[in-house]
């Protein structure tokens, strides 16, 4: 086995999930992530955790949804056995790495929507654990990224096997700015959007549950906007439910999407926005800071962390960003959309420029704006 797989497992178990002896650990393993699953199982055992490994293959998932569509039954009641498993878990690790990235593309849209809504209690139970999502490099993901398997493996491990403590220190500077700020203004040639972040808490996403960070790799700072107004364009693509979204533009009033368009995937975008009442509102503003991610791969776990990008999510807001007692935006979806900030862009907080053309004031690449 590639030694980097064992290193990946060690970072996941020790730095990210912080597994202790006696922890009940559920590991969900995609069909292409078997090797990482083996390495993680060994690491959990070495640390005294109690393991339950669950196969998470796209093929059976697709067949199940197709069967439910044919049976004309609803998803009103959450699956009690899955709920019980998650309620008993201390840690939930999701190891992605499917062999077909579009496996559920032909599932009827209304079935996908109903399934998402029906999973609400299960999703809440999973989010109540120390959960972490990561990905094992597979041939299908390499192909989706337009890379050879060897190049994609290097890309994944460059993003995962980082000096997380040093990156956490750098990102803490941005967290401090957002925590004390009131209004974020995003400006590009096609975007003019203002977001209220008053009384919000930004998350320094260090790839560790100790910092309310649940992705490996990570490397972003994110918060939950209280309000948003303006127009935003997303020039970086992503795939949702097997459909590619490109050239997305949203017009937002009082944090409600009132108009939308897309060069590709507009029907799927509309379907997502209609999932439930919260799906047409913004739940997240995220700023990528992981320089180990140097290209778009059409895998959101990596793409949203890429340095010199900004992303906004329609749907669910994360509780870690909200004041005590505030429910925030609820939804069955959380779909991130990405914008490239490397050229002709400016990000300000309360009128102060905190990022220009992708660079922060503490970086050498940051330059003063030319005089008019």
Predicted regions and their residues:
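Active-site bordering "gate/hinge" segments
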Residues: 1-229, 370
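Short, glycine-/Ser/Thr-/acidic-enriched flexible segments
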Residues: 32, 98-100, 138, 200, ...
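Short, solvent-exposed amphipathic alpha-helical segments in soluble enzyme
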Residues: 41-46, 201, 248-251, 277, ...
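Short aromatic-centered micro-motifs
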Residues: 186, 251, 347
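Oxyanion-binding "anion nests"
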Residues: 216-260
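Active-site lining segments that contact anionic ligands and/or coordinate catalytic metals
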Residues: 229, 245-247, 254-257, 280-284, ...
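Dual-mode signal for accessory low-complexity, basic/Gly-rich regions
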Residues: 259-323
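Internal helix-turn-beta structural module
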Residues: 298-370
